[in-house]
Amino acid sequence: MSLPHDRSRLLVDDGFPSEIFSHSIDRWIETMLADDVSEEGGSNNLVRAKLIAKEKGVICGQFVINRLLDKHAPNCSYDWKISEGELVKEKEQILQISGISSEILKIERVMLNLLGRLSGISTTTSEWVSDSNDIQLACTRKTEWGILDKWAVHIGGGLTHRLFRSDALMLKENDFASAIESGENQNDAIKKLISEINLEKNSKFTVIEVQNIDEAILAAQTWSEKQRENSTSDSVVLLLDNMGPMNARIVVTELEKLDLRKWCILEGSGGIKKDIISEWSSSGVDLISTSAMNRGVKPLDISLIIEGEK
């Protein structure tokens, strides 16, 4: 089944960062440099600097570092020794920079922070993917660096999910609670909000969060009825929130009995742990989503060594 959760195509345009991605890169770079206030250091000597991996991992962040160097170290040249998404070994050189010492030292810490953290996310994601038993993995909008986190998950082999709030429609528990009027209950709100969805705009990627088996069946029924009325046949993403693999299996079985499974992409989410991925793989869902691939992960340990004058 083709999943709408891979939005990475929106981040690249003809081999370069898209406008969306470029703006995000610039905002993070400028913020980090503004926070890293420092006196001028180094000299005008021409030096060669090497970025060396102190442990193995998956490299991510070339678009970001290229932008940092091009804009804030314009007199420097650079040469990547490791490609984006490539596995680097311990003590292996990642990048070589040649130029004025003061320019390199001014951005050194920000550069290492960016490359280290993004590579840490891509490395962690790749570890999750290797243990996934072929079930697809997506991150969530619980990010620390927004779109940069999403890119790193993509480089590690995961799915980006929604890049930002307006990237796709998502109806959550609080949306339903806010829509309940006098005399109505949660189920009434679910039916009402799904019935009001603009299919012309949102049919290809809509996510509906459900808390239990009954809500999942109700959401699937309401969606299928709306699709038939509109003479369309797109699937809705049912996000099974904190339901666990056992209840997810029941949802799959019940939807199949009611001939509703074909209308749904089932996403397991909430409390996902790497040591129970195998249980999710056999649950019948189409993917699982977790913030564990990008939040609180260990950055890849990278150092910068200046060799001295050329």
Role assignments for model-derived ranges:
Residues 1-237, 246-250, 265-268, 278-279, ...:
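Acidic/glycine-rich phosphate/pyrophosphate-binding loops and surrounding catalytic core
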Residues 242, 270, 292:
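Short secondary-structure boundary segments
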Residues 258:
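Conserved phosphotransfer cores of two-component systems
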Residues 274:
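Short glycine/proline-centered loop/turn elements that form peptide/ligand docking sites
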Residues 303-310:
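Active-site loop ensemble at the mouth of alpha/beta enzyme cores that anchors a bound cofactor
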